[in-house]
């Protein structure tokens, strides 16, 4: 069964108070959501943290096949290795995502608008 993971992160200013939102669906039905404040972060850090938290939930719940959707083109392209990760703070987060990706039998990271 292939799940869908929708992730979003936002920062009130850049950096500033940040929050993340995650929704996990199976067959079009929402099975889990996460919404929380993450402290002070940039928009890109928040986007990465949403992805990390969503992937962690999937790993912890033995979800092995997933399609991921984010509205951050930067994060999608960096994770898919089409863009270089230049910022040191994002390199750490990108590395965490790469480690988590290894836990899946199938994973696809997509950009949505």
Feature names for model-found ranges:
Residues 1-45, 56-60:
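RNase H-like nuclease fold core
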Residues 10-14, 52-113:
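RNase H catalytic domain
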Residues 46-50:
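Loop-to-helix element that buttresses phosphate recognition and phosphoryl-transfer chemistry
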């Amino acid at each position: 069964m292939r799940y869908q993971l929708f992730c979003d992160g936002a920062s009130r200013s850049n950096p500033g108070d940040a929050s993340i939102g995650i929704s996990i669906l199976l067959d079009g039905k929402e099975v889990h959501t996460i919404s929380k404040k993450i402290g002070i972060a940039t928009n890109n850090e928040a986007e990465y943290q949403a992805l990390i938290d969503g992937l962690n939930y999937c790993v912890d719940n033995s979800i092995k096949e997933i399609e991921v959707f984010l509205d951050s083109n930067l994060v999608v392209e960096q994770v898919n290795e089409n863009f270089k990760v230049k910022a040191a703070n994002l390199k750490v987060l990108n590395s965490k995502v790469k480690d988590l990706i290894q836990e899946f039998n199938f994973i696809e990271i997509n950009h949505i608008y």
